[in-house]
Amino acid sequence: MAADIRRKKLHPDGKVTYLVDRNVNYTNVCTINCQFCSFYRPPGHDETYTQSFEEISQRINELEDIGGSRILMQGGVNPDLEFSWYLDLISYLVKNHPDIHLDCFSPIEIEGIAEVSGMTTLEAVSYTHLTLPTKVE
């Protein structure tokens, strides 16, 4: 209700907008064991998966086909994925889907990625912020 009141103040003409987005779960392998998560599988479980870059890209193609503009990409803390895998994934997605806004990785994932890679969380975030492309030049 408060959001509707604010919208009416900002847009008295009655304009309403929305985003078409999609959640993409790139892996369900995780070592964290969060109490609220029924999605994860521990390493070695026979129901684990990690999608290839091409599989993730196909999910984004499906979003683009319906006019979508953003993905939320999350998974687990997969100890088999090196830091470079995440960098390569983001670079691949930016190159192949330049018009899609990428909203990737939860704080716990970033902490886990850093730990698996022998980095501090600050180093991991700083490195990705400074080196990853945000759009194709």
Functional labels for PLM-detected ranges:
Residues 44-57, 78-92, 96-127:
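Canonical radical SAM enzyme core domain
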Residues 128-134:
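Conserved small/polar residues in nucleotide/adenosyl-binding loops
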